Amino acid sequence: MAKLLLHTCCAPCLIYPLKRLSEQGFEVTAYFYNPNIHPYGEYKARREATERYSQDAGVEAIFPDYRPEEYFQAVHLREANPGRCVTCWTLRLAKTAREAKDNGFTHFTSTLLVSPYQDQNALRLIGGDTAKSVGLQFHYEDFRPGFRKAHDEARAAGIYCQKYCGCIFSELERYGKDKSNIGHKVTTSQGHKL
């Protein structure tokens, strides 16, 4: 059975990818690495929900220390969207890939692929490039068809469901009035145009 490390952004987004990957025969471990989530109370709510869901689902989960400085150092001078998002995805997928490589996993992927609000093409490219750099397989699958049902299931079960992606900038975009940075194109460090 192939071992897969699943970067996990939150409990609701874990539900469908975990089901699909388990059906495909992967031995899945969740990896909750999200230094982008702010404020700390929001991080704590998402982590606790992920801990509870992981226990209930019988899936092993790893929770590295919360280090928001890693996120801020990475996105410094890249605060405009989507440059900051590409940098954030790269940070989290690279950390997941290194953790997978160091601990005997053969594959990695992310629950970010379930969200209709994330850039699938960018995530696929970043995951593929990261996999090549560490010598692992990136499992790309468009999990979006299960997004709504999983989030409905989470709400019905009383699982905490957040209202923004996670970072302070996405919170401002969600609740603030200035939407001028949304939709600008960027180029990744590997030269992919997004």
Identify what each model region corresponds to.
Residues M1-L194:
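Nucleotide-activated chemistry modules centered on ATP-dependent adenylation/adenylyltransferase
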